[in-house]
């Protein structure tokens, strides 16, 4: 018989099918740990010429699974080979002496001090756009001596297992508001999750001396973002927080599902960093069923747990005009989203979005209850570059800052504040430079139960934020990533501080508009701002930089970090 081996990228498995009968003979588990949630992403297969061994490239665990398939139906797992970041193709040479593995994202992430900025354009050699920072690598594994390879495979497997994500031990003090045990009660009943667009840490908070910032590349300092700065000082400043995503296409998937599928990861690079975006459809946010992760999204977990939820703009399609209701293609959001809260639309003010959310909040106060999980989109920090007649990048970001402050002010003055935690993150960090890493971004946790006025330099990511909300709300994790993420426990404490927040007014002109003479205005005219990331990101970032810093200001380059988790030793030192 002739057998067909099929990689099920969204399921951690490989199906072996008899091509004569169409029957599935067996299913191979390609995951490092049996029973793992989705997230291994087996996406490429290779057989030795004699058909004795099958190699499975697992993109998201950076390892190749090896199977003995000489007896189909009774195949045996042999081990794992650690390779580079996000392996996308595995091939055995025709002579069977080498296994070649192409690693799509190379060996690691880095900083991008010369990253793009809204409003500025730098020479191509100096532009460190996140979508172009990945240098693919090739792993070459010697198979010429099968006995020697079998011995090496034991060591390879041990290394792969050491590198797997494992939940860190999380000792907490008595009365901690984030429950570790499933079903344990938390004094926090409500989670509000705010998603913003595309900014790095240094771009917004790089001027804060309390954190690890670089003020030389801070484009939207405290004079532009007073509420971002005040909230970071009043509550917690996170200066070591990263997004797993590169752009909005995978960013909204990671923000809602702690995972981006093989389909999304392989589709978005075709449309980003090129000038042919009309050629490919945006793959995410409910547009394609194949993009949906096997573990579902945050609202799916809430639905399964009986937790009430509501979306404001996330995975929502705008009405043709502001007088027409929005819609959604996501079944779980039907009846659980606000049809009058517009999603991404740079012609629509974030202040109007804030007003709509606040009106809903007041309605819930009158009714006596609100959804326990609310997801709110505030996207206008994306900006429209220097398009003639549009708000300047500074005005857009200041508008977003004021909307952010007003939302927090309203929540903290509401009857729900004593039982609420607000989590805030950017969907990605593609539109700016950062001296630590191109994935570092601004993030917030705002609640009566946070340790106010502190700096937390723990290594966190979007998956950490998702895991924390899941623990508070009693939701199951969605993927291997949130299941193994470091939860954000350090910023919380057992004592509450009910002082509300008072939003600061804007300190710049919110109506400042680009003129025909603005740097890059003519290029901005050709950009598509009807949806997120439809404009050329490299050019947009440069346009924003020069619009703020001046036409002659050179844009700073990407930095990639080897991520290090600091651990406090018994004597209090960081090792």
What kind of region is each of these model predictions?
Residues 155-575:
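N-terminal pro-sequences and low-complexity stem/linker regions of secreted or lumenal proteins
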């Amino acid at each position: 018989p002739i057998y067909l081996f099929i990689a099920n990228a969204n399921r951690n498995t490989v199906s072996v099918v008899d091509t004569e009968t169409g029957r599935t003979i067996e299913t191979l588990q390609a995951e490092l740990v049996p029973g793992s949630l989705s997230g291994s992403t087996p996406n490429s297969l290779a057989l030795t010429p004699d058909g004795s061994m099958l190699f499975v490239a697992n993109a998201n665990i950076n390892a190749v699974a090896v199977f003995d398939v000489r007896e189909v139906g009774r195949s045996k797992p042999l081990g794992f080979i650690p390779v580079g970041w996000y392996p996308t193709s595995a091939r055995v040479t025709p002579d069977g002496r080498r296994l070649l593995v192409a690693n799509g994202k190379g060996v690691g992430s880095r900083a991008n001090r010369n990253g793009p900025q809204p409003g500025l354009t730098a020479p191509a050699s100096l532009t460190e756009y996140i979508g172009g920072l990945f240098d693919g690598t090739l792993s070459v594994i010697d198979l010429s001596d099968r006995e020697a390879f079998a011995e090496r495979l034991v060591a390879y497997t041990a290394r792969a297992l050491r590198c797997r994500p494992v939940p860190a031990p999380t000792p907490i003090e008595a009365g901690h508001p984030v429950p570790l045990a499933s079903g344990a009660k938390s004094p926090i009943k409500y989670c509000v999750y705010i998603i913003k667009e595309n900014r790095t840490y240094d771009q917004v908070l790089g001027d804060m001396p309390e954190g690890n910032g670089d003020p030389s590349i801070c484009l939207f300092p405290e004079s532009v973002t007073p509420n971002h700065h005040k909230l970071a000082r009043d509550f917690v400043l996170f200066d070591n927080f990263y997004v797993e995503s590169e752009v909005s296409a995978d960013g909204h998937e990671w923000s809602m599902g702690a995972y981006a599928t093989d389909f999304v990861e392989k589709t978005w690079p075709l449309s980003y960093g090129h000038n042919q975006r009309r050629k490919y459809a945006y793959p995410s946010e409910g547009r394609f069923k194949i993009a949906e992760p096997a573990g579902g999204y945050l609202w799916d977990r809430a639905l399964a747990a009986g937790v009430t939820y509501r979306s404001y703009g996330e995975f929502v399609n705008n009405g043709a005009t502001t007088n027409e209701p929005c819609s959604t293609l996501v079944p779980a959001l039907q009846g659980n989203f606000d049809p009058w809260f517009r999603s991404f639309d740079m012609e629509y003010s974030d202040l109007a979005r804030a007003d709509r959310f606040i009106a809903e909040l007041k309605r819930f106060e009158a009714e006596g209850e609100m959804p326990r999980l609310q997801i709110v989109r505030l996207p206008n920090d994306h900006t429209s570059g220097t398009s003639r007649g549009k708000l300047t990048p500074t005005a857009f970001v200041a508008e977003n800052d004021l909307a952010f402050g007003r939302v927090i002010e309203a929540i903290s003055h509401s009857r729900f504040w004593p039982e609420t935690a607000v989590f805030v993150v950017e969907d990605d960090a593609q539109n700016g430079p950062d001296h630590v890493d191109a994935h570092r971004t601004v993030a917030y946790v705002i609640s009566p139960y946070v340790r106010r006025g502190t700096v937390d330099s723990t290594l966190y990511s979007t998956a950490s934020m998702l895991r924390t909300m899941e623990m508070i709300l009693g939701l199951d994790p969605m993927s291997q990533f949130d299941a193994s993420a470091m939860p954000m426990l350090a910023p919380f404490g057992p004592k509450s501080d009910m002082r509300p927040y008072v939003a600061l007014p804007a300190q710049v002109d919110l109506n400042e508009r680009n003129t025909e003479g603005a740097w890059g205005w003519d290029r901005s005219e050709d950009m598509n701002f009807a949806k997120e990331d439809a404009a050329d990101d490299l050019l947009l970032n440069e346009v924003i930089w020069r619009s703020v810093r001046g036409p002659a200001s050179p844009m700073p380059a990407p930095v990639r970090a080897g991520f290090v988790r600091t651990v406090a030793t018994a004597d209090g030192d960081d090792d």
